[in-house]
């Protein structure tokens, strides 16, 4: 993590991504995209809290995790830190930038998108919308 990103997160003492959004995304991904972790641990990881455990991505699920990171990056409370946040997440999760560039954008209405990926992308978008509706 860059020093600037860490200093900014600590100085403002707010979450980069709304914990409610993180929780609903966690519900859609837990034990599907990554091995089971507690919701609070996922929220802490996404918001760069110190000593947060790193989710263990399941085999052949890195592409879906890239999409999750992309969708969460659209919800950042400080958009100017988005690229640094994504870079940090990729390094922490052991995902290379090429994989992210290839998989981050899953378009549910695209002809080339698999049925599984369409369903997954819709679940993530629904989770984010639900958190917004509930206004957590």
Across the structure, where does each feature detected by a protein language model lie?
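Flexible coil/loop and intrinsically disordered linker positions at secondary-structure junctions
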Residues: 1-136
């Amino acid at each position: 993590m860059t020093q600037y990103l860490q200093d900014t997160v600590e100085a403002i003492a707010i979450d980069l991504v709304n914990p409610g959004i993180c929780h609903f995304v966690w519900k859609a991904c837990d034990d599907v995209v990554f091995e089971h972790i507690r919701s609070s641990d996922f929220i802490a990881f996404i918001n760069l809290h110190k000593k947060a455990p790193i989710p263990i991505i399941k085999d052949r699920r890195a592409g879906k995790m890239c999409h999750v990171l992309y969708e969460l990056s659209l919800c950042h409370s400080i958009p100017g830190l988005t690229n640094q946040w994504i870079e940090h997440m990729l390094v922490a999760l052991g995902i290379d930038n090429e994989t992210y560039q290839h998989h981050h954008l899953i378009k549910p209405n695209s002809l080339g998108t698999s049925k599984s990926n369409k369903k997954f992308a819709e679940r993530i978008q629904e989770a984010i919308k639900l958190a917004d509706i509930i206004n957590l």
